[in-house]
Amino acid sequence: MLRKGDLTQGGITTTLLQFTLPMLAGSLLQQCYNIADTLIVGQCIGANALAAVGSAYTLMVFLISILLGLSMGSGTVFSLQYGAGDLSALRRSIYVSFLLIGTVTILLNVAVFLWLDPILRWLQVPYDIYSLMRNYLWIIFWGIVFTFLYNFYAALLRAVGDSVTPLWFLAVSVVLNIGLDLFLILVLDQGIEGAAVATVIAQGTAASGILLYTYKIRPELRLHREDMRFDRSSLREITSFSTLTCVQQSVMNFGILMVQGLVNSFGTVVMAAFAAAVKIDSFAYMPVQEFGNAFSTFIAQNFGARKGDRIRRGVRSAFLITIVFSLIISLLVFFFAKPLMLIFVRPDEAEILRIGTEYLRIEGVFYLGIGILFLLYGYYRAIRMPGMSVVLTILSLGTRVVLSYWLASIPTIGVTGIWWSIPIGWLLADAVGMLYYKYCALRAANMQSHGLDKNPPPIYIYYRIFLSLQP
């Protein structure tokens, strides 16, 4: 019998695309909201408020990435258990994961409230926006529990093959947030505090809605008394996935921060060009990023169900889809780089336009590299090897940072070296990830999926792989 959200049956290509589209729509919706929120704050309150919200957003992303990493890691475990048809284990994992991430959320909230002022001073927030940023963050972090609840249940529903429901609740949240922004800022004149309150109310609505939906509509995910016990094996498995996913997210943010610092050293023109180009860049590769996340859930469910042949066919299908889509996007970005930059830059800002166009044409040629890398991230998370995803992230961003600083220091190369370091990092990580897939990962996955050990220590796996490679 085909279960709702079951990715272990049906046509592979159709299943992958149908599961990806709502996730992609959600990401696009979130990006559109970010742009709309920026415009409302900037146009209706002023430049200082815009700077405060922008700076606060960077800090929020870093802190909330901890919760996102925990939810993503838990989602992989949920997918494995759902694919295996072990609903009892799934419910126990839901309970343990909820307690774990809920506890981290509370501790994070307490830490922010206790050390918000020292954090802002460490970030060297200018005096003229200090109070604005502090007030905004103080209100926002009262609602962090809603961020936890929405992301937890969204990850759970996606893990069991439902990527549509989280999209609907996100859409309601975005529309409500924009409406409340306009009402609280324009009508009630609440300023930046009104923007923060609007965000918290919208997040609370989405969190409450998705929680009630899961409880009422998905009875197989509803916890029973016997499920509410602290299972150490579930905690160990969830922690191993979630911790590594958090490390991956932190490494990504830190690497991006270091490159941003180098870009800033070249002055405001380069900073402006980079800021505009990165917005276009993130939109361009967003589809392959979401496809990689959908692919991870597909692999995890089939890995849990021990459907090795379907996994292999899924890998081939996913790579083909990624290649075709990446090439199309590469062509569009390469040939329309200048018109795309003109969305954010005035025609008379010739130098900004030139630098941004150069960036997009260099990155655009290599979108296949980032597309494959997202597939590799998702694949290794799904087959119980999240550590390999971390290794590839460190390799990609480490290469980017080292090459950026080295190439940018050469006068004849300069800032262009930063642009080239990014795809070089992607391609190097791709090469390592694909070689590992060919020579090691398939053997390791086969050992685990055939019950050699449910979750053996990595050293044991690698030792067995080493022995299997000997002549």
Give the role of each language-model region.
Residues 1-20, 78-143, 187-243, 299-366, ...:
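Short alpha-helical transmembrane segments in multi-pass integral membrane proteins
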Residues 47, 51-58, 137, 196, ...:
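Small-residue hotspots at the loop-to-helix junctions and early N-terminal turns
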